[in-house]
Amino acid sequence: MTGIVTDPDVLRDLRIRSANLIDEIEEVLFRNQLSRPLSANLTNNMAVIQGLTHQAADLQFTKFACRGGLQGAILFAIDFVNYELMVAGIVEPLTGLNWTQAEVGRPLLEQVAKTIAPVGGAEAVDNVKGALDSIWSGGAVVFLDGTSGAVSINVGKINKRSITRPVSEQVVMGPHAGFIEDGMTNLSLVRQRLKTPRLWIDRMQVGRHTRTAVYLLSLYGVTDGALVDEVKSRLCQINIDGVLDSNYLVELVKSDRWTIFPTVLRTERPDRVAAGLLEGRVAIIVDGSPLAIVAPATLPMMMTSAADYYQNWMVATFLRIVRYIALTASLLTPGLYVALTTYHQEAIPTPLLITMAAARSDVPLPAVGEVLLLMVLFDIIREAGARVPTGIGSALTIGGTLVVGQAAVRAGIISSPIIIVVAGIVIAVLAIPNPELVQAVRFATYPVILGGAILGVYGILFVTIGLALHLASLESFGVAYLSPAAPIRPTDFKDFIIRLPWFRQTTRPAQTGYTDVMRQGPRSS
Amino acid sequence: MTARGLERWGALLLLPIFLTGCWDNFQMNQLAIVDALAVDYNRGQYHVVAEVFNTMAVPAPAQSSPTATGGSNHSSSVFLEGAGKTLGEALADVSASSSRHVFWASTQVLLLGTGALQQGLGPLFGTFLHYPQFRSTARVLAVPGSAQSALESDTSGMEITVAQEIRNQDRYLHHDLSQGWAPRLYDVMRWDTEHGRSMVLLSLEKKPESKMNPQFRMDQSLVIGPDGRARGSLPSHDAMAYLWITGRFSQGYVAAGCPAGAGQTTIYLTSVSARSHVVVQRGTVRGIHIRLTGTGKVAGPLCANLSGLNMAANRRMVSLTMQTVDWAEAHDADIFGWGQQIYRQTPELWNDMPGYWRSRFPHMPVSVTSHVTIVQGDEGRV
């Protein structure tokens, strides 16, 4: 039975299905082309590769001829290879050979691989995919006319910057080296600190298109094998087209995905990675990212600076207490200001109340409006300051200060006490050592303000309880986010708010270092 | 915790939401911040005057510049008035008289006129107790006559409020003295009337035609009986002994007669303390014995040897103390808290004699001994 379909819904469905079918057919054809074996015909190989890559501008075929007349070509990616090395190490030896067109076959490629390959090594390539994969890794692929297959010779050049100070985790005393975008360099920085065969490094490749190298580091005998397996399994499950930074992996592998609080530690410091490994954690280094991942991580870890371990333990303890005060202040102060000035004026000393009331006498906005306006304004200035070039940054600071600090008060848009409050928390929040926690606290401040505006201190209490419950519910690879505070673990208080001296820190953290508990032998303590 | 328990806790947490919320918030510039309150009673009505800070007179940071004078065109305070048959009605009337929300919590000074005191403290403080936002740290002062006249000042353009002026007097001139004289509201609320205690309120007076703000007056201090009504004014010469006995002040000057009729000299008491001993025999309070101890020095002419001056000074202190006790007994006002002392020492005895103390106190035998050591002061060396 035949007929003409007229129903628009059915037609639309058919159109979508046919479009999907075409896409699938194209994908299959593309894959077939990729896995196609390299033929003996040089021109044909060149045509296939150029067709597949749409004649990519950064790919170059250079033809050559041996002294004996054999034709060949070298395929490489511009700026991925050391050009001088390629010419001197591959092109010149090949053109000097007496091979003729009649001498075709596999042995020629093997000879190339064995005799003229530079130090970087060589490997045989059988199909188009193999050829393309190798050129993105710095290989020069040699084709010989009449010989099926090719040989890839590593003459790679790595574009990388030199090792510099970490941007977000600087210390006055202590090591100043920071990670860069090159994964191997980052591995070497960790290896310099852990010169032990127990440092195990697993290499994986993540990202269908980016094919990013990911290194999983663990300390054999110290890190729990189950933790390593878990992280490895989560990494293996990733099926994404590209990984451009370690944060891609963080969002894909971390335990609690719907939270603003960082549940893994991202650090630019190789010493923090080494310290994490010594505590029984794992680290992930992603090629192309200057930030390594340390997991599992807890909130107290985020409140810890690397400098804590490079200075007197009492000073470090004091600074940690100051940081916790700054954390609490930056989280609660704007909300408390709104609650006190709107609901609980009796809690304000009378002289201050009069001054504040006088300062607010001409302000049209309610206190919550003032606070939100100024908070958003400060966030805009801060965000803009993070983007603009250094030269314009000072102008921005002056502009922001003048506009917010002077003009807004004089114009009666905001009152002066609120500037003190917001400026205070802007400074206080910077005392938190972890930039991701800083962002989370900035975000969490807004619900506290709204809670204070709606229900006063009671509202703040509500939001704070909610926040505490949320934090207590988080975990990082099986470790409670608030540990050792919740669940309470007194043995780990040695490195919580108080940092005990090293001679008292004889054991690893119980939450991660249970495989090899003792950190120091009896003599050192 | 069971699910039912969780539900109960959840309900308890949620319930207070209905007690407060964004519907009852006030921005600070909507507040009429009360600094002082004067309460009078006449013609069957309570009259209340609230002195409110004029925030317009406070220089805002936006106006501050080297040329600005800080709101000198404005008076530092404005007055809100209200009247009603009860104090609550009068306070509500004050609230209604302002377009702003009257904010009682900052009240620092509470002036009570004679008329209001004659009505008794019970209705006054009962009302304040029902105003939860009323701060109980306010100083309570008595005003002979009208409290309103003491509070209202016609010195417009003053940079401080009348209440601030009163507090400054308290702070700089009478701080130590007023500890025992001008109790805070919470002291008054905790006042132990049950055990027969009377209270002394420092008085404040504004001279009728003076431009000056009201001043403290010791000689007009009002004694409030256990029933909360005024019993009379404590004479100024009795004030010192009252302070010694209650342990609120340990210094003072007394005039001592020189032996052999050689005139008088002045003794400066540097440290005096008193200890009251309640004599109980066979289940009855037989009397009170007061023992004065301490030191003093001759501040006037050294008109006799120290031994003689010692005796004269101690005699004078005994007579001063007895005079004060006599005044208190005559006015049936246990300002020394002896009833309270009996209750604390022997509660079972107190419980066995309901109403006994009220009738016994006016006739209670009291003895005084003084052992104050007088030394030669700088003046006496001349």
Ranges and model annotations:
Chain B
Residues T2-G10, P16-V382:
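Membrane-proximal alpha-helical signals and transmembrane carboxylates
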